[in-house]
Amino acid sequence: MNINAIVAISKNNGIGLNNKLPWKCKEDLIYFKNLTIGKGNNAIIMGKNTYKSVGILPKRHNFILSSTLHFSYVKNNFLIKTFISIDELLKFINNTNNYDNLWIIGGSKIYKSFLNKHLIDLFYITYIDKYFDCDTFMCKLPNYYLKLSEKISPNKFDDKHSIHYIIFKKIHKNMKIIYKNNHISMVKDIHFDNLPDIYFTIEYDNKECQTDIHHLSIYKN
């Protein structure tokens, strides 16, 4: 089972305004839908405010984290269920052993809670290169996430601003990472200060060495 997160952010790191998306980007909504439905038996995880904003999303199991909402039912063969905590949710998922991918879709407190528990393997970020008026912002990614890939859409938001689809991957202990074409990309501007001692092996210019995230400084943009 994979635990991933997906979010769209603006140039000023905003993700919401008045509990809604501050922009309309059909391309990104299709991207979100295709990923979260995907193949297999997938579920989305959201907080109460996100649930109030987007409602129940079809063709996926919907899990809502809330201390005040309490319901559980099946709709079109998909489970709609609330949980009071991440621990309760994970216990249920582990006991059922019935899910291929879990997708965390917001809001900001939910992202941060899962990051603090080191539960997110892949983080899918749609970056819209434009400033928006926002009242909710994305929390910082820990510095032990490496950029796995970045694709720039051939289309422009408002015919002016670029749309970037970026995937970050969490470094695991003793992980071997191979960098091709002498290119290594690190998260530099968005990070937490409390970095864990995660040792892993890197291969760079056909040479291997063991390092940890504190001393990984051979990066290029």
PLM regions with names:
Residues 1-174:
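Enzymes that bind and transform nitrogen-containing heteroaromatic metabolites
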Residues 196-201:
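Short aromatic-glycine-enriched beta-strand elements
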Residues 181-184, 207-209:
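Short acidic/polar mixed-charge low-complexity motifs
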Residues 167-172, 190, 217-221:
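Short beta-strand-to-coil "C-cap" segments at the C-terminal boundary of structured domains/repeats
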